[in-house]
From Swiss-Prot:
Coiled coil: none annotated. It comes from the Eukaryota. This is Mytilin-1. GO terms for cellular component: extracellular region. Keywords: Secreted, Signal. The keyword Signal applies. Residues 1-22 form the signal peptide.
Amino acid sequence: MISKYCLFVIVLGTTGTALVLTNDSNKLQNVKAVIAIQDKVLHFHDHTTDCVGELMCIFAALPESERNQTLSIPLGLLTTIATDKGRDRYSSIYAEAKKLLAGYPTIKHALNAAENGHSTKDKNVCASMYSKCPFEPDDLLDTINDLEDITTLFSKNVFGKVIADAIEYNYTQVGMTQTHS
């Protein structure tokens, strides 16, 4: 799926804020290739993007305290951008992310789904909105939580395996190695 999208820690103080901005900007730069690959993977493996849409909707519908626990993954940052309506103080980061995402229509669909979740605040409503996806909301959330561990993703449902394949493909494109069982 969409390289599951999420990452933020609030740091108080001027130095901390600058560090957060720099770190988030670097994270956005690092996910460019992943987003491009994920857009292609989504297009080829989930033509309706219902599972991606449901996942993003469910993720955005989570209470803020739960959503904040997953802010270490790129999906969190992108979901935050999608649902914030531009109110965030760090507008340079948002402008950078929106510019990055502008060329990826499948990703845009996923971000629109995040907006739906932010509005409904109910994972069951999200599941009914994206009824073509065969996975339960909790299974999709588990996939997000496993993003950092490709080995775990490979052992999950087909949706998790597609994501793991995309991540592994990205590693091979940039000359990194990633192992899994």
